[in-house]
Curated annotation (Swiss-Prot):
Stated name of the protein: DNA-binding protein Ikaros
InterPro entries: Ikaros_C2H2-ZF, Znf_C2H2_sf, Znf_C2H2_type
Role: Binds and activates the enhancer (delta-A element) of the CD3-delta gene. Functions in the specification and the maturation of the T-lymphocyte. Also interacts with a critical control element in the TDT (terminal deoxynucleotidyltransferase) promoter as well as with the promoters for other genes expressed during early stages of B- and T-cell development. Function is isoform-specific and is modulated by dominant-negative inactive isoforms.
Record SUPFAM superfamilies: beta-beta-alpha zinc fingers
Tissue spec: Expression mainly limited to thymus, spleen and pronephros. Very low expression in liver. No expression in testis, brain, eye and muscle.
Family membership noted in the UniProt record: Belongs to the Ikaros C2H2-type zinc-finger protein family.
Residue ranges of the region described as Disordered: 1-48, 96-115, 379-406
GO CC entries: nucleus
Location(s), subcellular: Nucleus
Biological process annotations from GO: negative regulation of DNA-templated transcription; regulation of transcription by RNA polymerase II
Molecular function terms, GO-annotated: DNA binding; DNA-binding transcription factor activity; RNA polymerase II cis-regulatory region sequence-specific DNA binding; zinc ion binding
Keyword annotations: Activator, Developmental protein, DNA-binding, Metal-binding, Nucleus, Repeat, Transcription, Transcription regulation, Zinc, Zinc-finger
C2H2-type zinc finger segments: 125-147, 153-175, 181-203, 209-232, 468-490, 496-520
Amino acid sequence: MEMEEAQEMSQMPGRDSPPPNDVSEENDEAMPIPEDLSASSNLQHNNRGDKEGLACNIKVEARCDEENGLAIDMMMNGEEEEECAEDLRVLDASGAKVNGSHAGGPDSKGPYSSAGGIRLPNGKLKCDICGIVCIGPNVLMVHKRSHTGERPFQCTQCGASFTQKGNLLRHIKLHSGEKPFKCHLCNYACRRRDALSGHLRTHSVGKPHKCAYCGRSYKQRSSLEEHKERCHNYLQCMGLQNSIYTVVKEESNQNEQREDLSQMGSKRALVLDRLANNVAKRKSTMPQKFVGEKRFSNISFEGGPGELMQPHVIDQAINSAINYLGAESLRPLIQTSPTSSDMGVMGSMYPLHKPPAEGHGLSAKDSAAENLLLLAKSKSASSEKDGSPSHSGQDSTDTESNNEEKAGVGASGLIYLTNHITSGVRNGVLPLVKEEQQRQYEAMRASIEIASEGFKVLSGEGEQVRAYRCEHCRILFLDHVMYTIHMGCHGFRDPFECNLCGHRSQDRYEFSSHMTRGEHRY
């Protein structure tokens, strides 16, 4: 068999082939067969042996050229795969070549490949450490870096290291300030594609995610989940969730029908939603919320840490109170008896208002409940003025929902509850009948009577002074603004949890000490 191949190789064009009579003349001579094809060129034989050795050398050189060409192709493919390491989809998905060897071929050594994984029957690779299945050796190589801790791509400006080149390129945009993703409807720009897709939803008309208890709508499911965690956990603690569920459900159904009528024939929302889905390269399960850059480089650290942190805490609490209540509603509430000409207007706008004869007999608990309802109405008036979405440069995915959820930072849970109960007033429509409103008012009064005790504050002249009491800390405030700032420091899940840094105290003494010292860690 080797002789026939040698003869065929010797008859290639450009080579001298022996004449046919030479074969018949030298049949009687012994024909040596070389044991090592690579060393056959060094053997000195007769004319026939030299030509056969030359043919064998040609065959060996052809095989070496094929192997060298295959190795060069694999090296070039390896360099290209290294450059495309950030895009895991550009790979050799067939699994035909793994470092120059074929799966199941004579050069492969069992089920293991040189990439450090286990070759599966379908051509994929399985990690030998955690068992994850990868579609190719490049994916497995990037995955192995999570086990070894290798981060070959390093930023030259700050020294941050990454496992993939795409993450490094995204990080470099932080230094350059480049924001390639821009909104075509406003001046908003961001660095991430998923942030742009979330911003495009702020331009859409509808809010598909609606709360089944209070009727509030959100554009993102994550905002709805946060709302349920804040609002309805508090309702369950107060025992009011079942009592107001039926009332608010009817109101939410009416609002739903009204929104459906307003959105019929509107194609803009559908186009924006499709555009947001097409722009998003990957799904954002939990949208990022940009809190803001904290720059401490210009601060002189001559004072103690408590002195440096305290102004920041006060500013944050004041901003939270202003964002929730608005500048108009932060003024102290002074009850004045309405004139006879205003009684008709007051009766139509505020059915819960009591006549002057009954107003003198109201206790402090009744007036506190009325103040809560008035605060909710003042909040609804201020929220209608700020209806347009914010198009700032922050990477926020749901600006309107974030502004609505800031309500939980600036005031107590009871005010937050009242704002949800009177959602019809906030929308400018009062669909509830008088009996349902009376039921809400009685529920509010009952909750206040259970949670609070009667008190009376007198001035130096003996006149009664309006006071606001924190039920958690048992502190009286003569100023409504200071009371609102203080209530903004309490958490919703736990009243003794700091709403600024999340520190949980055992009792009111530890909570007051924590707020006084200003030891907030972010």
